[in-house]
Structure formats: structure tokens, C-alpha cells
Design a protein with these regions (language model features):
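A short amphipathic helical element positioned immediately N-terminal to and/or at the very start
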Residues: 6-15, 80-85
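Mechanotransmission and gating elements of multispan inner-membrane complexes involved in transport
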Residues: 74, 86-91, 168, 177-182, ...
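Hydrophobic alpha-helical transmembrane segments of multi-pass inner-membrane transport and secretion
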Residues: 17-45, 270-309
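Hydrophobic, regular-secondary-structure patches
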Residues: 42-116, 123-126, 146-147, 164, ...
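Hydrophobic secondary-structure segments that place a key small or acidic residue at a functional site
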Residues: 98-99, 110-215, 239
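Residue-level signature of catalytic and energy-coupling elements of molecular machines
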Residues: 17, 45, 84, 125, ...
């Protein structure tokens, strides 16, 4: 029996037991498909996050504090960090509080429950780069000024999603309600992503003390305060981080009460987490491949056992 005859016989056997053949292949199909989908999604998410971190720049430093420390009687506040910026201009160029506000966003009769509201100072916008510390740029209008922040003005800068969804692209000078308080839109950020609800484009920036009065204090990693600083360049980021850590340790007397990370470290930590998650998910998906392989071996064994007599007759006839 030549190869062509063997192939035709195999196809005939598959057609005879269509359900058995389909179920045998299903395990392998699911396993291979799951691995491909997981790897594709994981790589896509990793690339997206790396792109977001690259937009921030390599000179961003994030500071989070969690209390008064072992022997301290006070927290480090933004004035302490302002002093650092003034004292070390060769390493640090700016600092701003970064307050996540618990605000209910409403325009006329529409609520925007997934819109993020953050309180920042005027230093959040960098005049030299014409963008924020996180890489966002203005499409129109202006950003918060020192006067806005110092006088607690009810003004805001909104993202592209809100500008389109609420104001149909004509947002400047319009009023939006934050927890019942009217805020005037003075600036609109450029579109940075898919401009969907809850995305990075669905954001509002207001003076940080206004945000604090809305009832906040819950930061990204527990109760405390969060600050953003910028170093003079990528090369000075590590030295700038050391200066900030030294100042925080002086107040808290323990590194357990604060965390300082550069944008490069944040990106590395995120990539490590994503890689670990992908390994776990791929391992789980690979179980389907193993189960599918065992299923194929089982069916092959059963098929051969069932057709032992037929195989013997064919061999005796010279097959």
C-alpha cells in the first residue's frame, strides 16, 4: 500500500467517525487558540503600557507617602518638596501634588461616572515641552495657572472624551458640575488614545486644594499622599530620586512609610508583572494542549484495538 492509498484510507476513516475526529481535534484547537490569544493580548497590553510610560518621559518621579512614620510628628507636604526643587535645581525641575478626587461629574442632565478627576498644581504642565508631566498636550485653551491654584479658582482642564461627549467639541468657557460645584472649562487636552469612556482621555484636572476639599486622600496604593516630580534629564533621574528619598527618610525615619519610583522603574515593574502573568496564563492554556494530546493518544489506541482483526487481515493480504 503506497502513501496515496494510505492517505485516502485515513480520510475515509475520519469521515466514518466524524464526531470522534472532531472531538479529538477540539482539545488541540482550543489549546493552540488559547495560547495564541493570550500571547497576542499580553504583548498588546505590554506595548500599550510601554507607550504610555514613554509619553511620560524618563524623568518623571512618583512619590507616595503613607503616614507619619515611627518617630515623626508630621508628614512631608508639598512645601517640603518645593524646597528640594529650589535647593537642587541641577537635579529637580518641578513638583506637584497629585490628588485623586471623589467627584460626581455632571453636565446638564448627563452623569459621567467613569470620568477621573485629579487635583494638580500649575507645575503639572511643563512650559518647555508644552505638555503635562504625564505627556498630555493641550488641544486648545490653557492649563491651570499659579493664580488658579493659589486662589482655588473653580476652573478645569478636560480630556478629549468629555469635550466630545458632553460639549460636542465646543467646551471652552462652558460650565461642568463637579460634586454640585460649577467649574469653567479653560482647556482641552489632545486626544491620546481611543477617546472612550473611562480611558486616559476621560479625565479632568482641577486645582489640588479644590480636589482635597471634595473628600479624597485615597491614593493609588492606600491612604496617603502622592506627588509627581521631574528631574532635569533622564541621566539625573536616579540622583534626583536619591535626594527625595533622603529627605523623606529624615522625616519618617523608616522607608516603610513612603515609596519613590522613577518612570523607568515603574515601566520595569509593570513589564515584570505582565511577563509573570503571561507565563501563568500560557501555562494554564498549555494544559489544554496536554489534555488534547492525551485524548489523541487514547483515541489512537482505541482505534487500533478495535481494528486488530482488520489490521491482521490486511497485513496477511500484503497491505
Amino acid at each position: 500500500m503506497n502513501f496515496t492509498q494510505s492517505f485516502k484510507l485515513a480520510l475515509k476513516s475520519l469521515k466514518t467517525s466524524k464526531m470522534r475526529a472532531f472531538l479529538t481535534m477540539l482539545g488541540i484547537i482550543i489549546g493552540v487558540g488559547a495560547v495564541i490569544v493570550i500571547l497576542s493580548l499580553g504583548n498588546g497590553m505590554t506595548n500599550m503600557m510601554n507607550s504610555e510610560f514613554e509619553k511620560m518621559g524618563a524623568n518623571l518621579i512618583q512619590v507616595m507617602t503613607y503616614g507619619r512614620g515611627t518617630g515623626g510628628t508630621r508628614d512631608v507636604d508639598v512645601e517640603d518638596l518645593y524646597e528640594l526643587v529650589d535647593k537642587y535645581p541641577q537635579y529637580l525641575t518641578g513638583v506637584t501634588p497629585y490628588v485623586s478626587a471623589s467627584a460626581k461629574v455632571r453636565y446638564q442632565t448627563d452623569d459621567y461616572d467613569r470620568t477621573s478627576v485629579y487635583g494638580v498644581s500649575e507645575a503639572f504642565f511643563k512650559e518647555d515641552t508644552k505638555g503635562t508631566m504625564q505627556g498630555e498636550t493641550l488641544a486648545e485653551g490653557r492649563f491651570l495657572s499659579y493664580i488658579d491654584v493659589d486662589r482655588h479658582q473653580n476652573v478645569c482642564v478636560i480630556g478629549d472624551y468629555l469635550a466630545q461627549a458632553a460639549f460636542r467639541g465646543d467646551a471652552l468657557g462652558k460650565t461642568i458640575s463637579l460634586s454640585g460645584v460649577p467649574y469653567t472649562v479653560i482647556g482641552v487636552l489632545s486626544k491620546s488614545g481611543d477617546s472612550s469612556e473611562g480611558s486616559a482621555d476621560d479625565v479632568i484636572y482641577i486645582p489640588y486644594e479644590n480636589a482635597q476639599r471634595m473628600g479624597t486622600g485615597t491614593m493609588m496604593m492606600g491612604t496617603g499622599e502622592m506627588f509627581l516630580l521631574t528631574s532635569t534629564s533622564r541621566d539625573t533621574a536616579s540622583a534626583a530620586k536619591g535626594i527625595v528619598e533622603k529627605r523623606l527618610y529624615k522625616t519618617y525615619q523608616s522607608s516603610d512609610y513612603y515609596m519613590v519610583m522613577t518612570s523607568a522603574e515603574m515601566m520595569d515593574a509593570m513589564n515584570t508583572m505582565m511577563n509573570t502573568m503571561m507565563i501563568v496564563l500560557v501555562a494554564i492554556a498549555a494544559i489544554s494542549l496536554v489534555v488534547g494530546g492525551i485524548g489523541i493518544m487514547n483515541i489512537m489506541l482505541v482505534s487500533v484495538t478495535e481494528r486488530t482483526r482488520e489490521i491482521g487481515i490486511r497485513k496477511s493480504l500484503g497491505a
